[in-house]
Regions:
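N-terminal positively charged helical leader segments and presequences
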Residues: 1-100
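RNA substrate-binding interface of SAM-dependent RNA methyltransferases
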Residues: 39, 47-49, 61, 102-190
């Protein structure tokens, strides 16, 4: 872990993965910057746990041990975390205010709203990244959370996607219009 990643980590700056295989795959991806590995005290050494710990040590990733209850608060999914969680820094994640304060504004943005199926969100993110969209507006509510199903459906592109966090899509679009952006809307119910 770099000194820069220690300073930069905040849940809005990345994603927390959980599960043994996803954590190992993320640790083995040299393009991903990992902040911290979280392990349950109750994990038995050997097998994939040893592989995870070895890979984390090789990359210089800080490892923290927790009781199951504390780990479940980190993973937010105690039934499926398998005693492993991993904080991944996503350099493309920004707040809308930071984007608007930047000297170089994005040229094309995609605003998401009301999409509650995580697989659909992941596929949209994957398509937007492939299309070269400069930013994806992601509201705090009214959309599937950035979790394992979104990550899987995005085929890993979410780690490098230009996600712009905002309170609501409506307030974000209002701010963008006030800053000279043109807005076009697609609605399935129009």
């Amino acid at each position: 872990m770099t000194e820069d990643s220690k300073r930069r980590w905040h849940p809005s700056a990345g994603l927390t993965l959980f599960g043994r295989k996803p954590a190992l795959e993320a640790l083995m991806d040299p393009l991903l910057e990992i902040h911290c590995l979280h392990l349950a005290n109750s994990n038995r050494s050997g097998g994939i746990i040893t592989q995870i710990m070895t890979e984390a040590e090789r990359r210089g990733v800080e490892t923290r041990f927790h009781d199951r209850q504390a780990l479940s608060r980190i993973s937010k999914n105690w039934r499926q975390d398998q005693g492993v969680a991993l904080d991944v820094i996503c350099p493309g994640f920004q707040a809308l205010d930071a984007v608007l304060a930047s000297s170089t504004l994005p040229r094309s943005l995609l605003a998401l709203d009301g999409i509650t199926n995580p697989q659909n969100v992941g596929m949209i993110i994957r398509s937007a990244v492939a299309a070269g969209i400069d930013g994806i507006l992601y509201p705090q509510r009214g959309i599937a959370s950035l979790g394992p199903l979104v990550i899987k459906a995005s085929a890993g592109t979410i780690f490098r996607a230009p996600i712009i966090h905002c309170d609501t899509t409506l307030s974000a679009l209002s701010s963008l219009k006030a800053n000279g952006f043109h807005v076009a809307i697609l609605d399935a119910h129009a």
